[in-house]
């Protein structure tokens, strides 16, 4: 299954808030059909929704998510926590969390168009796995800096996770350590994703 490129608000209405997918929020009460579901949700449906939240928030294909679950399953620690750490340490997500891009698809485009340097080298792979003490900067040209400047100006500095630091004047970010579970910016039960 390929990456989702359709209407984003439909996914947000169904799955809840997905800050990595879009900044838009659906209007309350507009075109909301009354849904008559039984009181008890089916277990399969709950697990599927949790998996879809991860997929759409991080912009992954089905195969990529399966690969991350497989890697997390081999770890000796909690599989769900390792899965979230792997996803949060992707370069496109780090750019989004630093405020250098307004959404994860926007961050992916910055990386693909070679505007981003990691430790002084151009990286054009959005799934690049960042490590602690990695320094993420923009290319030293006006166009790259202007693209990032717009996002940094509109981002909220209070939402910056504790494992990252950002220097807004030099367009530079630093990964200090691996993320704790409580700083994940998405309400998801990762154990249900692993069970799926």
Curated annotation (Swiss-Prot):
Highest taxon in the source lineage: Eukaryota
Main location: plastid
Disulfides per UniProt: none
Pfam families to which the protein is assigned, alphabetical: Ribosomal_S4 (PF00163), S4 (PF01479)
SUPFAM superfamilies reported for this sequence: Alpha-L RNA-binding motif
Gene3D superfamilies for the chain: Ribosomal Protein S4 Delta 41, Chain A, domain 1 (1.10.1050.10), RNA-binding S4 domain (3.10.290.10)
GO molecular function: rRNA binding; structural constituent of ribosome
Domain S4 RNA-binding residues, every copy: 89-150
Any single GO CC term annotated in Swiss-Prot or TrEMBL for this entry: chloroplast
Family listed: Belongs to the universal ribosomal protein uS4 family.
Quaternary structure and partners: Part of the 30S ribosomal subunit. Contacts protein S5. The interaction surface between S4 and S5 is involved in control of translational fidelity.
UniProt name for this protein: Small ribosomal subunit protein uS4c
